[in-house]
């Protein structure tokens, strides 16, 4: 039977996917999700004290027999630094959406302060796991500190300068598109324009239906492209099953 921390992880993933697909939650649903997530704050006994600034203080993912849990856009993290931070950031993001005050504000402020003491969160480190961890920080900053344009831009520069340094998991680039779908508009639009042709190439492909991860990726690509004025018309479009091939597709063309 899943423990309480596993249930919190599942709730975080399902809620994020629902919102990415354009779903809307009622106030009672928001309140219930908030309560369940707040009940799963870690105890002092589960906190990691080695290099404490690198690891979450409020939420860490379940043990899962030592296997790192995937991020909401499927990446299988290779280290706890990436997995643990991604998990905490996503929960804090949901809490911020549903109850942006009081203890939630305190946790976000504490986390921002923690990140300023990390190489991957504040010092533009791009080596090993720090590149992916820095991406998780960028998504966190987009809601936690949208006014800090310099910090946001610094993390973007790390991505642009070092993404091509080596071969990366296919989900890394798509995670960046997820980040762009929620980033402050004035910073996001030039980056989306830079990524536009690559996103179009991917969104116009067909995908195997049984692969659920491809479904959420199509919505991420839709949401990102739709921020550009010339693609605003696709904002509410849904993926569909091609009658001939039986594969999942998305129509990004004009009406």
Regions found by a protein language model. Give the residues of each.
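Preference for long, amphipathic alpha-helical scaffolds in soluble/luminal domains
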Residues: 1-255
């Amino acid at each position: 039977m899943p423990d309480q921390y596993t249930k919190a992880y599942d709730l975080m993933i399902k809620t994020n996917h629902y919102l990415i697909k354009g779903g809307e939650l009622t106030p009672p649903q928001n309140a219930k999700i908030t309560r369940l997530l707040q009940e799963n704050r870690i105890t002092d006994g589960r906190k990691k004290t080695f290099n404490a600034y690198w690891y979450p203080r409020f939420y860490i993912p379940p043990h899962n027999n030592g296997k790192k849990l995937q991020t909401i856009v499927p990446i299988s993290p290779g280290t706890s630094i990436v997995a643990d931070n991604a998990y905490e950031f996503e929960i804090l993001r949901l809490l911020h959406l549903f109850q942006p005050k009081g203890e939630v504000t305190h946790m976000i402020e504490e986390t921002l302060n923690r990140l300023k003491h990390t190489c991957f969160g504040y010092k533009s480190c791009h080596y090993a796991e720090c590149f992916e961890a820095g991406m998780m920080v960028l998504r966190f900053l987009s809601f936690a500190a949208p006014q800090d344009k310099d910090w946001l831009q610094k993390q973007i520069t790390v991505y642009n300068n070092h993404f091509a340094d080596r071969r990366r998991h296919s989900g890394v680039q798509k995670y960046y598109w997820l980040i762009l779908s929620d980033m402050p508009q004035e910073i996001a639009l030039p980056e989306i324009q830079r990524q536009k042709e690559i996103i179009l190439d991917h969104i116009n492909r067909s995908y195997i239906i049984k692969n659920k991860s491809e479904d959420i990726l199509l919505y991420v690509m839709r949401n990102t492209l739709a921020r550009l004025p010339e693609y605003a018309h696709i904002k509410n479009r849904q993926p569909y099953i091609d009658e001939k091939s039986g594969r999942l597709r998305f129509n990004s063309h004009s009406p």
